């Protein structure tokens, strides 16, 4: 069968949908309900995931330089990597205010989180407005570029398996703004496989598989059979 065309940039862009799901569909209901314990656990998961994603944008010393630097490299500084690094510093401060509010009670936590959500969602839009038109102009093939500049940085954080599991679980449960859970999961996982080496994919495949519901995973593999290894003939 002919598999759908892979969208390599989805390994980065679709994670914005994961973060939006976290903010709007997971964390906001918990904050509004005053369920501090459940919020604390979900917030801890979110913080690890967004830290890996930010590293894939900003780069990690000794590993990939990040997506913003990649776009600056190919388009004469047009992405503004330094500007986005500065935004990430500010984002981290607003994020820390939420963590600091956890022991202060439900009302303080909700207020801090809503301020953070507004900042974070505006930041995601700003990145998309600047970066996506540039991504569309990158030379092909793009998979080696994203592997070198972004994925290597994510792996260097030591939390890339969390990034994969968190992303797949979110998309499998909530989908994305423009796609069903099945479609959103497929697009992200297909991109992830494409930017991984075979050895890396052998490591991350079981993580992705276990993070999706069985029905979602079956639907994804039905469309992209190459995600799963072909059993050896006996």
Residue ranges and their predicted role:
Residues 1-234:
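Small-residue-biased structural context
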């Amino acid at each position: 069968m002919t598999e759908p065309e892979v969208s390599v940039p989805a390994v980065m862009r679709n994670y914005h949908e994961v973060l939006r799901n976290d903010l709007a569909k997971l964390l906001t209901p918990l904050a509004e309900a005053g369920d501090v314990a459940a919020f604390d656990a979900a917030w801890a998961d979110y913080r690890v995931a967004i830290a890996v994603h930010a590293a894939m944008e900003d780069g990690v010393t000794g590993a990939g330089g990040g997506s913003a630097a990649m776009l600056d490299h190919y388009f004469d500084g047009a992405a503004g990597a330094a500007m986005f690094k500065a935004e990430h510093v500010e984002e981290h401060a607003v994020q820390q205010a939420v963590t600091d509010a956890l022991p202060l009670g439900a009302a303080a936590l909700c207020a801090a989180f809503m301020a953070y959500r507004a900042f974070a969602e505006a930041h995601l839009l700003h990145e998309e407005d600047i970066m996506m038109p540039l991504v569309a102009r990158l030379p092909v093939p793009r998979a080696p570029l994203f592997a070198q500049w972004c994925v290597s940085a994510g792996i260097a954080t030591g939390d890339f398996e969390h990034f994969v599991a968190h992303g797949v679980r979110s998309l499998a449960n909530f989908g994305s703004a423009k796609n069903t859970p099945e479609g959103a999961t497929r697009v992200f996982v297909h991109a992830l496989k494409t930017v991984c080496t075979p050895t890396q994919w052998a490591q991350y495949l079981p993580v992705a598989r276990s993070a999706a519901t069985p029905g979602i995973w079956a639907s994804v593999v039905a469309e992209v059979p190459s995600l799963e290894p072909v059993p050896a003939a006996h």
